[in-house]
Amino acid sequence: MNISIFDLSIYIKFFIGLCALVNPIGMIPIFTTMTNNQSFLERKKTNIVANFSVSLILLISLFFGSNILNIFGISINSFRIAGGILIISIAFSMISGQFIKTIKTKKETKEENKIDNISVVPLAMPLIAGPGAISSTIVWSTYYSSWANLFLCSLVIFLFSFVCWLCFEAAPYVVQILGNTGINIITRIMGLLLMSLGIEFISTGIGAIFPGLLH
């Protein structure tokens, strides 16, 4: 499916979807905890490497994700349904307040790793560019597959990574201003947006597999 490259609404929707999936503000306490023992310069390096890795992972998903599905014989509509279910499960954990606890558990399993290793694993993947963000990116790439659309979606990915970088750079100040309560509220709002996106993915996939079912 191709659209006019001047239709900004689809790129805004893609950007909001990524932000809702990853919730950069909700990730701030995790980033602060994981880099607590790093110096100022080390923390900056971790932030840069992590978000560069996020861009690379999502770009690979954008341009080659559908080809990978074809290799394994997975239809895009089945993948849309599976991705939608995954996104809804993440949304449930965000709304119920379990999302941060889940991430902390993953972080705790990596505590014994060297500081230099946390930029890519587990920070870039799976905490930022996790299964939800990757599957969402692949789905968008199949919706709008012209080179012009993919190029603009690439710019959205770079913008998203830049926003994550900004959030992590401002982490100490954001924690002071919002506190845990403010961050939890934002996480729940993102969860509601995310659930809507997941339902849309599922309904589109079901509608394509079973034409007329949703009409």
From Swiss-Prot:
Keywords: Cell membrane, Membrane, Transmembrane, Transmembrane helix. It comes from Buchnera aphidicola subsp. Acyrthosiphon pisum (strain APS). This is UPF0056 membrane protein BU267. Belongs to the UPF0056 (MarC) family. The keyword Cell inner membrane does not apply. One of its GO terms (cellular component) is plasma membrane. It is a multi-pass membrane protein. InterPro entries: Multi_antbiot-R_MarC. The chain crosses the membrane at residues 14-34, 56-76, 81-101, 120-140, 150-170, 189-209. It is found in: Cell membrane.
